[in-house]
């Protein structure tokens, strides 16, 4: 418990593999809405929708790509 990121790889520049905590200044370590240890800005498409549904977009507050309510 208490892990902030996946400490499997010491090569991840966002995550301290020894402590499983984000490195100083990092907001995230991975995820569809994480780029270079930072949350991707709100509104960026993170998952293209199928059919007539709207695309899923980053919130700017999380590394996760939220599913829109039509999925």
UniProtKB/Swiss-Prot annotation:
Reported tissue expression: Expressed by the venom gland.
GO molecular function: toxin activity
Motif residue range(s): Cell attachment site: 50-52
Region (Disordered): 50-71
Domain Disintegrin: 1-71
Entry keywords, A to Z: Cell adhesion impairing toxin, Disulfide bond, Hemostasis impairing toxin, Platelet aggregation inhibiting toxin, Secreted, Toxin
UniProt protein name: Disintegrin viridin
Annotated source species: Crotalus viridis viridis (Prairie rattlesnake)
């Amino acid at each position: 418990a208490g892990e902030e990121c996946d400490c499997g790889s010491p090569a991840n520049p966002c995550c301290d593999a020894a402590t499983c905590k984000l490195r100083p200044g990092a907001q995230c370590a991975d995820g569809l809405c994480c780029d270079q240890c930072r949350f991707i800005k709100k509104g960026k498409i993170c998952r293209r929708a199928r059919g007539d549904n709207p695309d899923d977009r980053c919130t700017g507050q999380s590394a996760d790509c939220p599913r829109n309510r039509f999925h």
